[in-house]
């Protein structure tokens, strides 16, 4: 599974708990977007970034 290249956020695992307390496995997936970004060395590359990092401005998007 893909991981956020900025903060390292990835799929979380846990249990779905019913009212009767029975549990089954489930996952929480991060809101990852494939973004064309400018890297620190000046090159552009498509990377996976979570929506939280995009909103915080941690990624400089490449100009089209």
UniProtKB/Swiss-Prot annotation:
Xref: InterPro entries: Bacterial_rp_bL28, Ribosomal_bL28, Ribosomal_bL28/bL31-like_sf, Ribosomal_bL28_bact-type, Ribosomal_bL28_sf
Keywords: Ribonucleoprotein, Ribosomal protein
Transmembrane segments: none
Record-level GO BP terms: translation
SUPFAM superfamilies given in the database record: L28p-like (SSF143800)
Pfam families, A to Z: Ribosomal_L28
Superkingdom as given in the UniProt entry: Bacteria
GO MF annotations, alphabetized: structural constituent of ribosome
Keyword Ribosomal protein (UniProt): yes
GO cellular component: ribonucleoprotein complex; ribosome
Family stated for the protein in its record: Belongs to the bacterial ribosomal protein bL28 family.
Protein name as it appears in the record: Large ribosomal subunit protein bL28
Organism: Persephonella marina (strain DSM 14350 / EX-H1)
């Amino acid at each position: 599974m893909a991981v956020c290249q900025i903060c390292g956020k990835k799929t979380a695992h846990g249990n779905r708990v019913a009212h009767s307390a029975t549990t089954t496995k489930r996952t929480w997936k991060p809101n990852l977007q494939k973004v064309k970004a400018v890297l620190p060395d000046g090159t552009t590359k498509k990377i996976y970034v979570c929506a939280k990092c995009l909103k915080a401005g941690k990624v400089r998007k490449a100009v089209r």
